[in-house]
Amino acid sequence: MAAKWEKLEGNVGVLTIEVDAKEVNNSIDAAFKKVVKTINVPGFRKGKMPRPLFEQRFGIESLYQDALDIILPKAYGEAIDEAGIFPVAHPEIDIEKFEKNANLIFTAKVTVKPEVKLGEYKGLAVEKVETTVTDEDVENELKSLQERQAELVVKEEGTVENGDTAVIDFEGFVDGEAFEGGKGENYSLAIGSGTFIPGFEEQVIGLKSGESKDVEVSFPEEYHAAELAGKPATFKVTVHEIKTKELPELNDEFAKEADEAVATLDELKAKLRTNLEEGKKHEAEHKVRDEVVELAAANAEIDIPEAMIDTELDRMVREFEQRLSQQGMNLELYYQFTGTDADKLKEQMKEDAQKRVRINLVLEAIIEAENIEVTEEEVTAEVEKMAEMYGMPVDAIKQALGSVDALAEDLKVRKAVDFLVENAA
């Protein structure tokens, strides 16, 4: 087999591939063995029709497509290895010649991984993040704990305020007509949560138990129910009960209920401070890592093929679909609720997809430029770490991974980011 690579404009080129006649004939033979198993001919058992009779009745050309399906993937794979190129999309194949006892000649128009011209990636100036924890930070965290342990109690006197929960009946009307899904009874609405459409909750504020009111709102233009989107509506609302949060007292008893590992409020505050310090340090490290990677990516020159962005978009949509399934939802339901579709979703994700592809290409280029390698011991240590994290045997982790090659590549990327951080200004 012979292969010749000719670079065209941008990241596109043409592979001209020639395969020996012997391999062509072998592929035709293999195609016959496959096809003949499906043919019933009177006088012969299924799959036992002689080759000469087959060619006489159907013509040898009837085998060519199956033969091509056999020979093309192998020939194309060997050709890209020989040419030393890295395709990022399916090729456009053009068969110039295919027949028995003759060399196969075909071309493959290929989009390849782009060349990355690295810019500055050492000595990058990154902003130092403040990691000091103040007394105010601790008090705010304590207040959040207090809020989470608050109990809802009935407010006997007074009106609905922001932060209260109002138990209401409601029924919505558009153009004087009730609409599907617009009615509820004894619904607990947390005021200020933004659960209902904009403007609704604010108009419930100030009502007393037993009072009713017509709430005038407009559905958002992007509302998931197209027949309601952008339309004004009137909701008849009656407040049955008002509940307010009753905060527990901040004392040693509260501290023990919040965290059984502490005995006093002071111990709880000290633990909260330690947790906040660790959290801020972790957050600062992540921010620096993200920043150096983004700076290095921005400094590089790359002509990214659209095919790579499309592939990344498909991957992102699959990831999004998996997250939805964990919440008991699927893409079709999501499209209905949000009034969007597959094209709009991809358009929303496109900028992030471009960013991901650029960053991945730049990190790969840095790995190559700095000869970053990963040892077998480092891969083994990572597998053991994963086993401990998931509470699984090491062998089970290895079996789940199948191959550790992808893990080794991930570790190289991590090392590349470490390199950028260590060499930042």
From Swiss-Prot:
Function: Involved in protein export. Acts as a chaperone by maintaining the newly synthesized protein in an open conformation. Functions as a peptidyl-prolyl cis-trans isomerase.
Domain PPIase FKBP-type, first and last residues per copy: 163-248
EC number(s) reported in the record: 5.2.1.8
PROSITE patterns: FKBP_PPIASE
BP GO annotations: 'de novo' cotranslational protein folding; cell division; chaperone-mediated protein folding; protein transport; protein unfolding
MF (Gene Ontology): peptidyl-prolyl cis-trans isomerase activity; protein folding chaperone; ribosome binding
Family: Belongs to the FKBP-type PPIase family. Tig subfamily.
Record keywords: Cell cycle, Cell division, Chaperone, Cytoplasm, Isomerase, Rotamase
Catalytic activity: [protein]-peptidylproline (omega=180) = [protein]-peptidylproline (omega=0)
Record organism: Bacillus anthracis
Gene Ontology CC annotation, any one: cytoplasm
Name of the top EC class for this enzyme: isomerase
Domain text: Consists of 3 domains; the N-terminus binds the ribosome, the middle domain has PPIase activity, while the C-terminus has intrinsic chaperone activity on its own.
InterPro entries: PPIase_dom_sf, PPIase_FKBP_dom, Trig_fac, Trigger_fac_C, Trigger_fac_C_sf, Trigger_fac_ribosome-bd_bac, Trigger_fac_ribosome-bd_sf, Trigger_fact/SurA_dom_sf
Signal peptide: none
Name recorded for this polypeptide: Trigger factor
